[in-house]
């Protein structure tokens, strides 16, 4: 069974609740590396946990700024890249989170080296 959110199909392996979807047009892309694309949203300023969204090979995940998988899922190798990026770029992620909470434009964050 497929569900649709924002007019886009969601794969069977993804939980709909707790995972914010709608990647693409109008969604701030803050980084990309090794086929992984990282997004952050402005409309999540009421969420208590600083997090971002990762997309890779048709799979999506919400990941905390500390690199903990919150919802969804990625292949283990891609998740490892995301977690390494989060540990290296934690300060930049938190700065963007604060900018999002203030409804300010988000800044690009450098990819993995």
Sequence positions of predicted segments:
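Extreme N-terminal basic, low-complexity initiation segments
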Residues: 1-8
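Charge-dense, helix-prone N-terminal extensions
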Residues: 24, 33-39
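Short acidic-hydrophobic surface loop/beta-edge motif
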Residues: 29-33, 54
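A short, structured beta-strand/loop element
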Residues: 41-78
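C-terminal structural segments of small proteins and small subunits
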Residues: 81-113
């Amino acid at each position: 069974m497929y569900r649709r959110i924002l007019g886009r199909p969601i794969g069977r392996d993804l939980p709909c609740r707790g995972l914010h979807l709608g990647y693409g047009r109008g969604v701030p892309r803050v980084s990309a590396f090794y086929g992984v694309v990282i997004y952050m949203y402005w409309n999540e300023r009421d969420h208590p946990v600083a997090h971002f969204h990762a997309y890779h090979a048709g799979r999506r995940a919400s990941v905390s700024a500390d690199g903990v998988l919150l919802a969804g899922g990625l292949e283990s190798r891609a998740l490892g890249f995301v977690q390494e990026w989060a540990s290296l770029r934690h300060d930049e992620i938190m700065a963007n989170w604060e900018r999002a909470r203030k409804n300010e434009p988000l800044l690009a964050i450098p990819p993995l080296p």
